[in-house]
Amino acid sequence: MKQNVLISIPAFNEEKHISIILNQLSAFKKYVLVVNDGSTDNTEQLIRVSGFTYISNSINWGITEFYKTSLEYAIKNNYTHMITLDSDGQHDPSYVEDFMKKLEHFDLIVGNRFTDLSIIPESKIASNLFAALLSRKIHGIILPDVACGFRGMKISSVFGGYRIEAFGVVYDMLFRFVKSGSQVGYVNIPAIYHPSDVYATKIDEIVSLLNVARQYIDWSVLEKILVKIIKRKDFKLRLFGYDFRAQYLDSKEYLFSTDLIKATAYYDQFKTNPQFQLL
């Protein structure tokens, strides 16, 4: 399948990591596209020297434009599938082949970073579970990780007409695939976090998720949460028996928390229940 899969990578001021990532993808060089998204450091020069194909934007357009640019390039060059991964070192390129294999059976593959919770900060576990369960409420899909940017997908009409801005496109893409009846799976990938670090969630990311969710479900609770966020207040939400608390921080971020024992049980089901063992 390799010859039909475009590997597209967004890069914004990644001079510290981009050469390492591209070197690890040398075996797939002719299938790789780098989208230099308005970098102001030496990222573009390093990509040029590497000899990889790239497109440069004069300003930083963000993730929605990245997907649009990548899809247009893929269609123009007759690719049937696409894999995306970040250029900041958080996604291990050695897993690209795992995504390619899974794409032979699924329409969308999302990377799952939550196989070893001992190396993931509790706040990150809570915020990811919040997004996963909200996605379940919308479409009934049960996945361990719904926000990972390391993903593979079949290029289809599902992608048409994106109007979602900022991080919301990551969720909208998933919801569109599920709504269309596509087969969605996941690939386990390593998480690169330090468990003692505190990972707060940016307000823009939360608002993006909630705004996309509102397009698929009529639930007044989401409106109430958005009002609290606008007022920079803490909020709580209960989803499928899991209680979430989000504390507003002065840095315009929220710190999520939940019952870690229950959260661990949620993620363990993907290890023990054959229904979820998609690898």
Give, region by region, the residue ranges found by the protein language model.
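Short, well-formed alpha-helical segments that are part of the catalytic scaffolds
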Residues: 12-27
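Acceptor/aglycone-binding surface of glycosyltransferases and processive sugar-polymer synthases
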Residues: 59-73, 93-167, 194-203
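A conserved acidic beta->alpha catalytic loop
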Residues: 36-44, 89
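Hydrophobic helical membrane-anchoring modules
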Residues: 1, 164-279
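Short beta-strand-to-loop acidic/aromatic patch adjacent to the donor-nucleotide binding site
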Residues: 79-90
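Acidic helix N-cap motif at the loop->helix transition within catalytic regions
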Residues: 16-20, 41-49
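Short hydrophobic beta-strand elements that form part
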Residues: 6-10, 56
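Short loop->beta transition adjacent to catalytic acidic/histidine clusters or analogous donor-positioning motifs
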Residues: 2-5, 25-34, 42
